[in-house]
């Protein structure tokens, strides 16, 4: 299994067609493609010679974002993203409909030019509990605005077997305070 920070930000979906960014949307299905192009950590094109269409998910956040800020404020900051405006960052963490394991997908995302979250790997569930305790003590992922950690299955076979529910994947679990 893998463990990543649960970034306190706004989930964003991106769609690339023949390597070009063609669509971006928030979890509320808000179309934000024009504004998202201003975020420097989102590639406008990727090398995708294997697939005609690729969809991925990540999180848009500000290094200074905290839980008291609203996600709507974060999205509205997209309208003001300039050289002197707020710095918004994007971490990609999932390729939809992928048959690869989690770590391979993260490597692919990096090859396409995305930043990905710090990812820890273990086969021991007790280690996940120890990492969660470290996170609570602000000793893990403390350089990021987090509101928990996420434990995920690494295996694509296990992920496909467990499937997804209407609100979240059954192969991932968020651990918070």
Name the predicted role of every residue range:
Residues 1-177:
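RNA/tRNA-interacting regions in translation and RNA-turnover enzymes
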